[in-house]
Amino acid sequence: MAPKRQSPLPLQKKKPRPPPALGLEETSASAGLPKKGEKEQQEAIEHIDEVQNEIDRLNEQDSEEILKVEQKYNKLRQPFFQKRSELIAKIPNFGVTTFVNHPQVSSLLGEEDEEALHYLTKVEVTEFEDIKSGYRIDFYFDENPYFENKVFSKEFHLNESGDPSSKSTKIKWKSGKDVTKRSSQTQNKASRKRQHEEPESFFTWFTDHSDAGADELEEVIKDDIWPNPLQYYLVPDMDDEEGGEDDDDDDDDGDEGEEELEDIDEGDEDEGEEDEDDDEGEEGEEDEGEDD
């Protein structure tokens, strides 16, 4: 599984902290420390604070340089992402198969969601140029009986304070085809409620902006599926695996049967040898009788 990479938060400019105005005499007395050497301790504390300011400065510089490296490699990856998308387009139902095979995404998919996702042709994740301010996820669809849109987009933004927000394309549902409404009605009839993390329909996610910071689906798509979708498309069929195990068991049973047959044959051979010995003994007794 590809390692998850989180977009760094915006950098906060840190002001150097002034040396702490500690009542050292009072502190020393309350801690039971001797007053001797208080001046040296005060100087040490001031120097520690100066060193800490330098550490903070380096941490800030480190974050800025990491962002530059990320920006560089994002540009280098783009041609390969484009080539991968072109190849994926040659495989029917690649997108819906990938989502269905992913354990977290599949739990959000209803039957009608899967039907609509069969028209999905491409998914793309695009980070904003500065990276730290957010990214966009685009879903491309063929002509279908569910909605008019050819592209759905959902954007995630981080402001200067690091607070997340999101916005998305409005889905133009065709008459009577809004799967989010039907899903909601079905759940009301069954008197069931889902948590925020599990919307009634996969497509409800596009209109849910209530808590962008707790959006698990966008993290899964961006940090898990997008880096390497092939690993989920190629998930082996569990039925095939179980069938293979049954075949192995049958082979083992067959081997055991052959061993039992071999044991029986060996037993028959032993009995045959004993019969020959008995016959030889009887012949010997008859010969002795004739001599007499």
UniProtKB/Swiss-Prot annotation:
Induction: Up-regulated during protein-induced pluripotent stem (PiPS) endothelial cell differention. Up-regulated by VEGFA and POU2F1 (at protein level).
Bias (Acidic residues) ranges: 237-292
A single GO BP: positive regulation of transcription by RNA polymerase II
Coiled coil region boundaries: 35-78
Segments for region (Disordered): 1-43, 158-292
Low complexity: bias regions: 1-11
UniProt tissue specificity: Expressed in endothelial cell (EC) and protein-induced pluripotent stem (PiPS) endothelial cell (EC) (at protein level).
Recorded GO CC terms: chromatin; cytoplasm; lipid droplet; nucleoplasm; nucleus
Pfam families: NAP
Keywords: Activator, Coiled coil, Cytoplasm, Differentiation, Nucleus, Transcription, Transcription regulation
Entry-linked InterPro entries: NAP-like_sf, NAP_family
GO molecular function: chromatin binding; histone binding
Intracellular or extracellular location(s): Cytoplasm; Nucleus
Main localization (coarse): cytoplasm
Note: Probable retrogene derived from SET transcript.
Functional summary from the UniProt entry: Plays a role as a transcriptional activator involved in the early stage of somatic cell reprogramming. Promotes the differentiation of protein-induced pluripotent stem (PiPS) cells into endothelial cells and the formation of vascular-like tubes (in vitro). Involved in the transcription induction of vascular endothelial-cadherin (VE-cadherin) expression. Associates to the VE-cadherin gene promoter.
Similarity annotation: Belongs to the nucleosome assembly protein (NAP) family.
Name of this protein: Protein SETSIP
Organism this protein belongs to: Homo sapiens
